[in-house]
Swiss-Prot record:
InterPro entries, alphabetized: Archaeal_histone_HMF, CBFA_NFYB_domain, Histone-fold, HmfB-like
Name recorded for this polypeptide: Archaeal histone HAN1 subunit A
Source species of the chain: Thermococcus zilligii
GO CC terms: chromosome; cytoplasm
Cross-referenced Gene3D superfamilies: Histone, subunit A
Keyword DNA-binding on entry: yes
Keywords, alphabetical: Chromosome, Cytoplasm, DNA-binding
Region (Interaction with DNA): 20-22, 54-57
Family: Belongs to the archaeal histone HMF family.
Amino acid sequence: MAELPIAPIDRLIRKAGAERVSEDAAKALAEYLEEYAIEVGKKATEFARHAGRKTVKAEDVRLAVKA
């Protein structure tokens, strides 16, 4: 089960053009986004460690998304 709140996910889907969004759809997207964010976070952490830092910076996240 995703830790992300469902209401903001619902708003994102509506912002993308949907008129109505089922709770299951919002939950499914929340779960996917959480999994993706964790993977990006892991890669960003690797970039920070490789640079000799404990702190993950925005540039690490940008690189992780592109990797």
